[in-house]
């Protein structure tokens, strides 16, 4: 059994770590609230944009934009959204596992995959496991802006425009609630039709001003940008929620460990006192 002094040192060490994890839990809770506000503010725009674009995909368009047309799939692209920091449980690795499984499925069909990475964890992971990385951006912090995301988005859209990509997806964690975040792979291009069954039964027609091509060229790019930005803010809210939960679990585990060490310390101290008393009694008997 370890000595009482050594056990006291371990208890102090765990208590110090517990203070750190508690502080990190409180910081993550504060950041999560701000991230949720940002996510809630942008979600209606992103969902409305997706709904309008879904109507367009079902519409009788006088100009058929390339983003609306299905192609034979030879190469697909993924915009992968991850965190810049760790200590957020299995948030990143669960997302990467889902993506790797999908990439394996494409590979078995002879389809190649390009990756545009957002966040240092994705850059680190796919840099080690392999994958064709065509763009990456890291270090966006807790308040990302659309201008920081334009680089990877532009690279993937250019590849799609030039026919080097036949499908484009965004990969991110969707924020469900504080305790639940869901890894998601969502198709961006070609434009998926609206999922609502009632909408599919309707025929949509639009009048465009000034002309369909100019409007659709701009609108469809804005659609992709809005979905990527929403994916990033959802992932950020998921990160802070996962970190808060992970740090709370670490703090609680620290408390349990301290109790166990306190028991061991008490037993060690009791054994030490018993030994001292035995030595005193033995010495008195010898006299």
Curated annotation (Swiss-Prot):
The keyword Membrane applies. GO terms for molecular function: ATP binding; proton-transporting ATP synthase activity, rotational mechanism. Its main location: membrane. Produces ATP from ADP in the presence of a proton gradient across the membrane. The gamma chain is believed to be important in regulating ATPase activity and the flow of protons through the CF(0) complex. One of its GO terms (biological process) is proton motive force-driven plasma membrane ATP synthesis. It is found in: Cell inner membrane. SUPFAM superfamilies: ATP synthase (F1-ATPase), gamma subunit. F-type ATPases have 2 components, CF(1) - the catalytic core - and CF(0) - the membrane proton channel. CF(1) has five subunits: alpha(3), beta(3), gamma(1), delta(1), epsilon(1). CF(0) has three main subunits: a, b and c. It comes from Yersinia enterocolitica serotype O:8 / biotype 1B (strain NCTC 13174 / 8081). PROSITE patterns: ATPASE_GAMMA (PS00153). Belongs to the ATPase gamma chain family. Keywords: ATP synthesis, Cell inner membrane, Cell membrane, CF(1), Hydrogen ion transport, Ion transport, Membrane, Transport. The keyword Transit peptide does not apply. One of its GO terms (cellular component) is plasma membrane. It is a peripheral membrane protein. Disulfide bonds: none annotated. This is ATP synthase gamma chain.
């Amino acid at each position: 059994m370890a000595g009482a002094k050594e056990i006291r040192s371990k208890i102090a060490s765990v208590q110090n770590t517990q203070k750190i994890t508690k502080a990190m839990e409180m910081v993550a809770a504060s950041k999560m609230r701000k991230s949720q506000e940002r996510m809630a503010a942008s979600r209606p725009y992103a969902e409305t944009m997706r709904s309008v674009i879904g109507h367009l995909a079902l519409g009788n368009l006088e100009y058929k934009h390339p983003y609306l047309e299905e192609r034979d799939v030879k190469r697909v692209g993924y915009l992968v959204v991850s965190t810049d920091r760790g200590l957020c449980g299995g948030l990143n690795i669960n997302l990467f596992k889902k993506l790797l499984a999908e990439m394996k499925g494409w590979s078995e069909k002879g389809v190649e995959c390009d990756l545009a990475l957002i966040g240092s964890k994705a850059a680190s992971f796919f840099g080690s496991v392999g994958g064709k990385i065509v763009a990456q951006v890291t270090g966006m912090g807790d308040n990302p802006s659309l201008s920081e995301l334009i680089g990877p988005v532009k690279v993937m859209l250019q590849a799609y425009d030039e026919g080097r990509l036949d499908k484009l997806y965004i990969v991110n964690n969707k924020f469900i609630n504080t305790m639940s975040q869901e890894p998601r792979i969502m198709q961006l291009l070609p434009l998926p039709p609206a999922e609502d069954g009632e909408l599919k039964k309707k025929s949509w027609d639009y009048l465009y001003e000034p002309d369909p091509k100019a409007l659709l060229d701009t609108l469809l790019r804005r659609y992709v940008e809005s979905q990527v930005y929403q994916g990033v803010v959802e992932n950020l809210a998921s990160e802070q929620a996962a970190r808060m939960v992970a740090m709370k679990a670490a703090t609680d585990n620290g408390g349990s460990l301290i109790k166990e060490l306190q028991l061991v310390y008490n037993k060690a101290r009791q054994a030490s006192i018993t030994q001292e008393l035995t030595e005193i009694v033995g010495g008195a008997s010898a006299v």
